[in-house]
């Protein structure tokens, strides 16, 4: 069971989490025009668009044929999270009258692709944006929702305005204690060990592993940090860093049986110290606080990982918290 926010959904009316019963009020398709294609995923094609009524830029996510229930889930989750810190805003839901293909209309974020952007970051930028991402994660977890697909591709950053948005809630799900969830979620490089060993009773802490994998790639300048060629190889790549003895301790604790395919590929590995990943190119991002923070995220045992709220209180973010306090103080000065 999750260490935090375990009973959020059971304390809410059924209509909050029972997405099957959601009623979609469709907007007017003709209010939107496609400008250009900006991306595609497994479940959708994404376009920059324009609202022809008010000439506001927007993002149009055209959903590929998928179960109605999945579409309802994404919409319900976005509605429940509306107005939360750094959560992408769902503006409208429309559908084509002929094909019945639904599209989700979102706020536009002037994103720079992470492979271009992250190398430009300084140490403070990394701290700042990870802190902004933690705000979104703590908020969604506090609302009883796991994102289940945290990765750089789903974190939009408008660097000029220092604005971050967590996007793509298509795999997100409501957390109910004791429920067994599908382990075929998240993207390979960001899958937590629980998914790779087929442990289905996972919780919000899955998102904290994904955040840790993302953070490791940012501070060590190694993208992705765990570079598996398949799901089984992904666990091997993790074990080469965190150690096999530690993996078996985790499996024993939760009485998890490892799939027989691992017999041939796992081997035995000593835990690698985090400092061994430091080199001339990445040392400016790495501090004792950064390593301590990373170490408290990338744990096999999901119950040992920091929660999003605990993470925000970590000393690594002291400069970010100080800056925010200073900004509030200065804003107060200008008002008075």
Curated annotation (Swiss-Prot):
EC nos: 2.7.11.1
UniProt catalytic activity: L-seryl-[protein] + ATP = O-phospho-L-seryl-[protein] + ADP + H(+); L-threonyl-[protein] + ATP = O-phospho-L-threonyl-[protein] + ADP + H(+)
Keyword annotations from UniProtKB, A to Z: ATP-binding, Kinase, Nucleotide-binding, Serine/threonine-protein kinase, Transferase
Active-site residue list: 149
One of the record's GO cellular component terms: nucleus
Gene Ontology process terms (BP): DNA damage response; regulation of cell cycle
Protein kinase domain location: 32-317
Family to which the UniProt record says this protein belongs: Belongs to the protein kinase superfamily. Ser/Thr protein kinase family. CK2 subfamily.
Protein's UniProt name: Casein kinase II subunit alpha
Gene that produces this protein: cka
């Amino acid at each position: 069971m999750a260490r935090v926010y375990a009973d959020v959904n059971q304390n809410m009316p059924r209509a909050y989490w029972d997405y099957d019963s959601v009623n979609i009020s469709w907007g007017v398709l003709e209010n939107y025009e496609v400008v250009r294609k900006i991306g595609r995923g497994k479940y959708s094609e994404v376009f920059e668009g324009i609202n022809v009524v008010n000439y506001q830029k927007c993002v149009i996510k055209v959903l590929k044929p998928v179960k109605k229930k999945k579409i309802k889930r994404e919409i319900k989750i976005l509605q429940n999270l509306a107005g939360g810190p750094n959560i992408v805003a769902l503006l409208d839901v429309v559908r084509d009258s002929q094909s019945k293909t639904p599209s989700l209309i979102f706020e536009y974020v002037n994103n720079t692709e992470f492979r271009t952007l992250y190398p430009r970051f300084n140490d403070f930028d990394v701290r700042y944006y990870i802190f902004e991402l933690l705000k979104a994660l703590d908020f969604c977890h506090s609302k009883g929702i796991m994102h289940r697909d945290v990765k750089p591709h789903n974190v939009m950053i408008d660097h000029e305005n220092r604005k971050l948005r967590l996007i793509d809630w298509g795999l997100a799900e409501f957390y109910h204690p004791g429920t067994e969830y599908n382990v075929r979620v998240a993207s390979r490089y960001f899958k937590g060990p629980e998914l790779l060993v087929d442990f289905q009773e996972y919780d919000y802490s899955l998102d904290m592993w994904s955040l840790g994998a993302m953070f490791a790639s940012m501070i060590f300048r190694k993208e992705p940090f765990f570079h598996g060629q398949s799901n089984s190889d992904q666990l091997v790549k993790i074990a080469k860093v965190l150690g096999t003895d530690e993996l078996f301790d985790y499996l024993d604790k939760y009485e998890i049986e490892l799939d027989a395919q691992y017999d041939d590929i796992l081997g035995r590995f000593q835990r690698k110290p985090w400092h061994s990943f430091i080199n001339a190119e990445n040392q400016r991002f790495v501090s004792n606080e950064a390593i301590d923070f990373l170490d408290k995220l990338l744990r096999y045992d999901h119950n040992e990982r920091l929660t999003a709220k605990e993470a925000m209180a970590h000393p690594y973010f002291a400069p970010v918290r100080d800056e925010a306090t200073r900004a509030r103080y200065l804003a107060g000065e200008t008002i008075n």
